[in-house]
From Swiss-Prot:
Taxonomic lineage of the native organism: Bacteria, Pseudomonadati, Pseudomonadota, Gammaproteobacteria, Alteromonadales
Cellular component annotations (GO), alphabetically ordered: cytosol
Gene field: pdxB
Positions of transmembrane segments: none
HAMAP family reported in the protein's UniProt record: PdxB (MF_01825)
Protein name: Erythronate-4-phosphate dehydrogenase
Protein location: Cytoplasm
Coiled-coil region(s): none
Assigned protein family: Belongs to the D-isomer specific 2-hydroxyacid dehydrogenase family. PdxB subfamily.
UniProt keyword Oxidoreductase, yes or no: yes
Binding partners and assembly: Homodimer.
Amino acid sequence: MKIIADENMPYVDALFGYLGKIEYVNGRTLTPKQVEDADVLLVRSVTKVNAELIKDAHKLKFVGSATIGTDHVDVDYLSLRNIYFTNAPGCNATAVGEYAFIAMLELAQRFGESLAGKVVGIVGAGNTGTAAAKCMQAYGLKVLLCDPIKALQGDTREFVSLDTIIEQADIISLHVPITKDGEHKTWYLFDEARLNKLKPNTWLLNCCRGEVIDNRALIKFKQQRDDVKLVLDVWEGEPNPMAELVALAEFATPHIAGYSLEGKARGTFMLYQKWCELLDFPVKKSLESLLPTFQFNQIVSQGDLTESQLLKLSRLVYDLRDDDVNFRGCFSTATGFDLMRKKHTYRREYSAISLTQSVDYLSDGKIDPSMLSALGFN
């Protein structure tokens, strides 16, 4: 059995190696010739899986995408060809939620503000939006959720309109899939008109798809409204973001919000589970066996934690400042953008850290130990 796998997908050999011969490829430049004799195709979001790519892949039985989204895959065509498809919904949700929360802690410190007491609007209440909301709520922040699709589907959570979020939220974090049609399309959801409605000093984070915001309109807006702070992980035209916009963002990264070791491992593992299920093979591997021991796996708390100390603790698993600096130095070429994503292998999630001494909650801005547990620390 021949398995074609994206070279940036981790743990493929550990999980699929005993099932067949693995050939690693550049997912962004994958050609029909490379997949024509494949039995299994494992991809990420950079690969467009459609008729053009797999028209000659007559042996292909399984396509797995280690992503939460499916907009890069022609699922109807795969169904027509009777090719089994699966993705990995929720695999990186925790990583994205923690990225958004850590970014907010970083903004608060940079601009001498407290995150506590702010109102956060989450646009998109799927897996990543829910994970982000969980972090914010664990920290005691008021969270407003906007997701008209979920509301129509009968989700019982309380939802508000996007206009309400724009009017009331101090921070807006975007977590929607990209859709170009329909009443609730998300392509250019934040266009020039909507950007101009943002209240003073809003923090705007985009952790989903670059085209959810009109990037050219955002450049014009930010040049006039520097009070609005931007954290951008996704860009129109990836892997070639607009240089003007990178310069204007407070924090800029190359579509790696979901790139924790845990999230990457979970994505590949979910595909492995599905493939074993499809073939009626036993699942011989475990997710836990893939992850290395974290160098700071046990932390002793010396007392109460302030917000600033929580940020320092967060930087042990992920220091956003490093990625921001590195990205600004390499984003100018598509090769640099993708190379940084490929080399992004060090980030962990809060769960990698165990706190071994409880802390007391005080009313002077210090952190409740149950809050740390709810954030994901052990």
